[in-house]
Amino acid sequence: PIYHSKFHELCRRLKQINSKIDIVTNGSGKKKDWWKKLCEILTSEDSIEFSIDGLKDTNHLYRINAKWDSIMDAIKIVTKYKINTTWKFIVFKQNEHQIKEAESLSKELGIKKFKLIKSDRWWKKDLMPSDEYVDPIYEHQISVTKGTDKKSTIKQGCMTVRNGAPDNLLYIDSDGDFYPCCKTGLYGFRYKNIFSPKRKKYNIVNNTIEQILNASEVTKFFDKTKSYDTADNCCKIYCGGNKTND
């Protein structure tokens, strides 16, 4: 989100209405003055989560084109303020040996929290880390993809009330495209459902959120989440499987 041309203005408006802002970013490509300006807008209730998957020699392998030095410059500025900071580290084969060193560096830089993420984002087998760092959802994802998954329950993450109206975790990406959640907006799923950006149908430039949610095929999409059998594969993977309805 930090690459939006009016990001500072948007943050300022949100703070004027007493909103709490949580920013997740790779932290790359912005000048020091840009970060200082942002930090002067944010307060101690806001947070910035830096997505850094490795160290200088490995982070760019997943975070394509990320510039290490500019990320370090950003962190050194942000940590001078009372903003909550997190280093989020997704584990891959190429960086699992750097976990302890990265955590140590995060403390040295003054980052408040180091968060280790097990992942299922494998487009190549050689990216898979050791078993202890593989997200348990990975095996379920494979079975859904192959059609060998067993019938299960489903917990609708997009609804605070089961089988109610979609009102939770709804997602709009940096291009203004709407998705039921951030997972359906992932590259591996976004082109396989009715919300595909190629259709140019559910973008907030041309529609209000209310108009999108009231569209016939959108209501049908959410209706299908009531049953594991009829739900979209993405919903089966992230809201079904070994999850419960508790």
Where are these regions (language model features)?
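Radical SAM enzyme [4Fe-4S]-AdoMet core and its adjacent flexible, acidic
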Residues: H8-R13, I17-K20, K36-N207, Q211-N214, ...
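Polar low-complexity intrinsically disordered regions enriched in Ser/Thr and small residues
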Residues: K30, K150, Y191, K243-T244
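Active-site metal-binding loops of divalent metal-dependent hydrolases
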Residues: P1, G27-S28, G54, T184
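Juxtamembrane/interface motifs at transmembrane-helix termini
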Residues: N26, K200, N242-N245
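Acidic-and-aromatic substrate-binding clefts and catalytic sites of carbohydrate-active enzymes
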Residues: P1-S5, S28-D33, F92-H97
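Cysteine-cluster motifs in flexible loop/terminal segments that predominantly coordinate metals
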Residues: N163, S227-D246
